[in-house]
Amino acid sequence: MDRYVTDIKNGCYQNPVLPMDFSDPDAIRVGEDYYLISSSFTYLPGVPVLHSKDLVHWERIGNCVERLPFDRYAQPAHGCGTWAPALRYHAGRFYAFIPLPDEGIFYTEATDPAGPWSALHCVKSASGWIDPCPLWDDDGSVYMAHAFAKSRCGIKHKIQLSRLDPETLEVVEDGPIVFDGTLSQPTAEGPKMYKRNGWYYIFIPAGGVEYGWQTVLRARNVYGPYEEKIVMHQGASSINGPHQGAWVTAPDGSDWFLHFQDRFELGRVVHLQPMCSVSYTHLRAH
């Protein structure tokens, strides 16, 4: 399998930790192991799975998707296929929630992240639903945050929260719009949802792929109202559009954020940033 190393051998690492195209990354830790997946559009096998022991040294171990269950993908389809996925671990199983912007939201599951992964199962048949992320709550409820693709459905800047059937993981209720970023967070998309210490967090990129920023929403109730705060932006650095990714906590309790940077012809490379808490109100990536 492919291995990617950006350790500079003095106790430090250099960004990007994945200096090649792994767009729209999501990652989790299970025990001592980290796993990362990314979008792959119409390339197959798709939605690559990477493994790491330290968030710096990565190895590609498999793919979540062997084929797309639609005849149209027998031919190239620019801008279609698998968009920003989410990776979660629940009750001994790995779940990858994967959007196809023209067909809907799907999931695949596995007991071993290297595979085999199940055939895609439809969560919601819909055009324009993208960037899904599930959350299994403490009371057994299951939710899914997602964004919209204006190119498909005419809706933009909004995050919706739907309720899923705990057994089938299919949408049973199209929930409310829990955040509208039209004025303050244009192009709000790519939600990643977490629950920590009684708070619901939704991490959203905003501002667009090339020059956007990272925003965090939080609320005490899953349906809000959500506070918002920009936690990372380019500033005076050379890292354009640092946003969209995963909040991961290491075994030692330290928090880290994996996100992409659009390097144009080189693709979307992945950076690793340490995180800290600021006045116990929000999280910030350095």
Task: List the predicted regions and their residue ranges.
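Surface loop/turn signatures of beta-propeller and other carbohydrate-active proteins
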Residues: M1-I28, V56-Y89, P116-D138, R163-K192, ...
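Hydrophobic core segments of beta-strands in well-ordered, beta-rich domains
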Residues: I28-Y43, W83-P101, F106-Y107, L120, ...
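Beta-propeller domains
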Residues: S38-C64
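Conserved Ser/Thr-centered positions that define the repeating blades of beta-propeller domains
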Residues: S52, T108-T111, L164, A219-R220
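Active-site neighborhood of glycoside hydrolase catalytic domains
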Residues: A147, S162-R163
